[in-house]
Each structure stands twice: as structure tokens, then as C-alpha cells.
Amino acid sequence: MESFGARLHRAVAERGPLCVGIDPHPGLLARWGLDDDVHGLERFADTVVEALGDRVAVVKPQSAFFERFGSRGVAVLESTIRQLRLAGSLVLLDVKRGDIGSTVAAYASAYLEPSSPLHVDAVTVSPYLGVGALAPMFDMAAAKGGGVFVLALTSNPEGAAVQRARTAGGRTVAQVVIDEISQLNAGAQPLGSVGLVVGATIGETGHDLAAVNGPLLAPGLGAQGASAADLRVVFGSALPAVLPAYSREVLAAGPDVAALRAAADRVLADCRAALTGS
């Protein structure tokens, strides 16, 4: 079975280094002229799939914006996932789950088991209970060709108080996460399947992110304040592994399909220039 790292590497080579989020929050639904209900949610998601599903390497639905409508919202999420995969995009479900034992194993089955209606290519997870507690998620990903993105250095300013705190051994909490994920990805070619979430807004990290040997999801671009040019400052020699993530910067162009595509093309061009220097 082909690994997620290999599939992501190929998707980026074919479609370019870009992840676009699907974040149907009330303000954006209103901007699109849609009601803040499950029907508006469905129209929003279907439009994004139509516009971007066959041209963007990775699409990242934010699960919370679907879950807030209960079972009907989750049904829309299931449909969105199916449509995106049929269109050829890799689906990264933003859930930021984190737990222990049988519970994290259940999360792994929900998102990474091919028979699940919520089966996606990769998920985001939180390491606050310890990176080792996420082992069932990593194991399922390895067995089923899935991917996992672990929060490390996030774009929200509140994160620094925890992530840059130092452990008894002198390493920052973020460095502990980086080191453990680096070990998981050791020797993987062309890219490991366990990635990190590293915000594009955080400036120089002081960490060797190239050693991770896995994909580096970079949120915080566009509406959150970072530009594609900031990627060079944050990631340095790790630029080849960076997957820039935009949401509002692209989605604000909707609901017109052509405008959404043009917005995605524009930020992709910015990302290519920043990542390659051309």
C-alpha cells in the first residue's frame, strides 16, 4: 500500500503546494448570501468542491463547522469527503483529536479506516496527552496508508505559552514533539506520513524542522496575517516539505466558482514563488 507521504508528494508535484480549508463559519455563509443552516452548509461545501476538488492538492474541511449542525451536518461532511476524493483531492480533516488508549484508537478507526463513512486521507491531532498516547493513530495511518498532522508550533498567539515552555530536560515542549515525530519518520522516502502543524505567523522557530522528514502544514496565511513570503523565514531549509494552508483568503472570493478558482491560483502562484525562490 502506498504511504500517505508518497501520495502527498505526488499530489503536490501534480497540482502544486497548496491546501485550502473549508471553514463555513456563520460570517462566511452570510457573505455568500447563504442561510446559517444545514442547507447553506451543503451549498457552501458543494460549491467549494466544484471549484477546487479537481485542481487543489489538499482540501481541509474543518469538522467543527459541520458538527455544529448535528447529524445532518455530519452527513454533509461525509458527502463532502466523498466528493473531494472522487475529484482527486487529498482530504485532510481538521479535527485536532487527542486522547489515550481505546478512545484514540476509536478516533483512528473513525477517520483512517477505509470502511468508515468519515474515512479521509489524513487528520490533525493534539499531542497534549503525550505524543506516545497517539500511537494507535500512527499505527492505523501506517497500516492503511493514511497521514497524521500533529500540532507543534501553532499560529495562535496563546499557543506559545505551552509550546515554548521548557521541560525538565531543557527542551521546549515543541522540540519534544518535533523530536518524536522525527523518529517516527526516520528513513521514509520520499516523505514521512506523520507531519507537523507549524504556523506561518510565528517567525523564526529556532528548531530544525528539516529533520522531521514529514510534511509541514502551514496555517495562518492570508486573513490570519502571514504572507507566502513569511514561509522562508519560518521554515528555512525545510521549505520543500511545507504545505501552505489558506482558508478565508480563498473562500472570500465565493460563491462564484470561477472567482474561487482564480483566488486559489493566485495564492498557489505566491506559494510557488516563496517555496522555490522563482
Swiss-Prot record:
UniProt gene name: pyrF
Group of enzyme by EC: lyase
Recorded coiled-coil stretches: none
Active-site feature positions: 96 (proton donor)
EC assignment: 4.1.1.23
Pathway entry: Pyrimidine metabolism; UMP biosynthesis via de novo pathway; UMP from orotate: step 2/2
InterPro entries (alphabetical): Aldolase_TIM, OMPdecase_AS, OMPdecase_type-2, OMPdeCOase_dom, RibuloseP-bd_barrel
GO biological process: 'de novo' pyrimidine nucleobase biosynthetic process; 'de novo' UMP biosynthetic process
Keyword Lyase: yes
Top-rank taxon, per record: Bacteria
UniProt keyword annotations, A-Z: Decarboxylase, Lyase, Pyrimidine biosynthesis
Name assigned to this protein: Orotidine 5'-phosphate decarboxylase
Homology family: Belongs to the OMP decarboxylase family. Type 2 subfamily.
One MF term in the entry's GO annotations: orotidine-5'-phosphate decarboxylase activity
Catalysis performed (reactions): orotidine 5'-phosphate + H(+) = UMP + CO2
Cited HAMAP family: OMPdecase_type2
PANTHER family: OROTIDINE 5'-PHOSPHATE DECARBOXYLASE (PTHR43375:SF1)
Lineage: Bacteria, Bacillati, Actinomycetota, Actinomycetes, Micromonosporales
